[in-house]
From Swiss-Prot:
The lineage of its organism: Eukaryota, Metazoa, Ecdysozoa, Arthropoda, Hexapoda. Residues 52-64 have a biased composition (Polar residues). It is a multi-pass membrane protein. Residues 782-896 are cytoplasmic. This is Protein bride of sevenless.
Amino acid sequence: MKVMDALQSGRRKPLPVALLCILVTVFCVLECHGADLTSPTKKSAPLRITKPQPTSQQAKPISITTRAPTTVASTTDDEVSSSVDGQLAPLISSTTEGPSSGTTASLVPEICLNGLQLTVNSADEGTVIRKQEEFVKILEGDVVLSVLTKDPDSALFVINRVNQANLIMADFEIGIRAISIDNASLAENLLIQEVQFLQQCTTYSMGIFVDWELYKQLESVIKDLEYNIWPIPGTRAHLFPKVAHLLHQMPWGEKIASVEIATETLEMYNEFMEAARQEHMCLMHFKSDDNVYIMFGNKLASHFKENGTLFSVPTDRTDDEFLADLPNRAFVLMENEIDLSTAVELDATPTALDEILIGKSVLPSRVLSFAGSIIDLMNWLRGSLSKHCKRGEEHDLYVLESCFNFLNFIEDWRTSEYRQAHDTAEILSLLLMRKLGTAMNFQMYQKKVLTLDKITGESRTELREIASQNFVTNVTTYYHYNRDNHTSLELKTKFGQVFNCQYSAGDNRRYPFLFDGESVMFWRIKMDTWVATGLTAAILGLIATLAILVFIVVRISLGDVFEGNPTTSILLLLSLILVFCSFVPYSIEYVGEQRNSHVTFEDAQTLNTLCAVRVFIMTLVYCFVFSLLLCRAVMLASIGSEGGFLSHVNGYIQAVICAFSVVAQVGMSVQLLVVMHVASETVSCENIYYGRWLWGLLAYDFALLCCVGALIPSIYRSQRNYREGILIVIGSVLIMVIWVAWIALSLFGDEWRDAAIPLGLQASGWAVLVGILIPRTFLIVRGIERSDIAQALPSLTSLAFAQNNQYSSEQSVYECVNPAMRHCSQDEVNHQSPSEIPTLPLRGGGPRRQQFFANLRQANANINPQRPPPRPQQSPSRSSVSSLPPSPDHNKITRF
């Protein structure tokens, strides 16, 4: 009743009722929000794992574990569950797609949970998936480096020494992920996975180091990844000087033997030969009954079947299989492996080894190569920490939590010119392993097979120490020699004394040492691809040039009259024949069977002569072509009114220009040949050809080409001589482009220069052929056909056509001379008008044609003897020209 009364009273008082409803609504809304905020089924926002960005205050990284996290509560509402999954999907950042588990573990990229994986197809076991634990060794640290190498233990040892020495003076350590590369074909996949791991699973990652050989193999992939990836310097810089020194100091007999060097790569061969020359030791291959073989690498031992003295230099760790493939009494030169244990004392300062290194062995060359780059990187890191971090109050070390943007220096360090080299003693001192220097030795062993039982054939192989050289002190020690040979080592002739360089050929870096003896070198065609290309171009160009030359000679013999004197065209064709034939000296070589073949004094003279012939031909044929083009360009620019000099240069002056240009170049080339022959010991053609003096030899030819280019504005509009002006312009521009191309290519090295010079010659010849001679031949053929058609028309018998034809044949300008029309009256000559239109070639200037025009002139005199001369038609552009001067006498007509 009270409620009804209240409602009834509310009808009478609506304002209190409305206020009551608003209060009830607000209370309900607050209750609902409170329930939502305290609901156990509400999940927090998921955490996205991406590459961390440096901030002003960065906390130390938290390690990611693989155990599944527990959820706060679960919901039974399907709609809410699907909605949450839809929000999580775009936030998950992973390199590999995996099934959704519905837990926060799915927020972590799969590569962070499982690490790196390799799928290997084996013939015996099928498809095998290798886990990260099988090929990755890890030293934990706050700032991480990765290494892809064949020797992960040496890389781990270097980082251990960096942390023990605390080169960065910080309260954190450097971590490393050392990835063992057993198969080079798997390196690309592992590198890509490691980049993804460092980007998504680590907070502070500096970059990745890769073995030198792998870096060269993956260089294109590394550029595409755009990550901090650097090569580890090769170990050959530490090994090859030791090999050369031990060989030089090794006791040897008095008899010299032929030396054959076998390497896996040409780069390895060149580096060893340079190390041998530093010892002034020449290891040459020649005809001999006694042979010495020096074999580099671990892959060639099983292929060695020769008899002789063998020196084997493995570049990686050796095993029993490698030693078993070597013949008995073979010498092995390799670095000793240093065993790591708790009993090894590395330095006077007490240090410790990480547990993962106990019982392992390292190679000195690997340690020194990697340590040099790491020390320089740590110095840069310490400098960056001093700018972006604060020191702690207790230990005066840089505190990681106070650092910001301290890895930005890497962009500058990755540039090689900013790096510094460190010698061996400095590396050992900085990494607190000075006492390890006595164990870093490069040793020479000799394999000996001892027969234990003659009946069963049981044998035992041992390596007998011959000599060793220390990496730090370079002191050489010999073992057992005095006892085994019953003589003093100092009284024995050394290997380096027997194979000493007998003669040094000046500064010739290609053939620096010469020998007396029988030559083993021979002639052959080069096996390079560019030789086949150049020979093809030369043969085709020679065929085309001969075809044009035969065509012109045949047409001249038939009595055709061309625009202009064909003599220059014939000379230009002959010069092109020389251009295309000049490829022969560049396509042959004088070599031996081995790269280190014995070079005698006679061989050096032969090589010097071949080089001189190449230089002489190159400069001379360029001069022939450019001189002819220049004299034609001068003539075109000096005649007519198409923008030239408006002064005439006759054929004699053209001949003088061409002859002077050629004789000047011949004189300079002959002088060079004489100087190289007289002073062959001090002046080497190889140094000229492969050095900067080559540009001095080509300076004169380049000046002629520039002169032709300077005349382009004066000749490009000329229509004379089958539009020779524009054709010379096209040919000159093509030659200039070709010159820029081959000169640029020749700057990349000797091999590029060997190909660029002859190919540039052939391309220049084809530029003249395609730009000038082939179009001109087409215009000649077209002119001959037009002349044949014009002479076949009925108007040939008309008097007007005969007079016009007579005029066109009597032009004395620019060799437009027709011998058949020279006998004309003076009145007809005075009424001729100038014309710049090229004339048509006339067929045959024989007696029948002369009799035909004589009859026409007689008929003209009988029909109209008092005919007034026609008034010349003056064009507005040539109003100042009325007529040409009288035609010269028969014996004064000159063809240009």
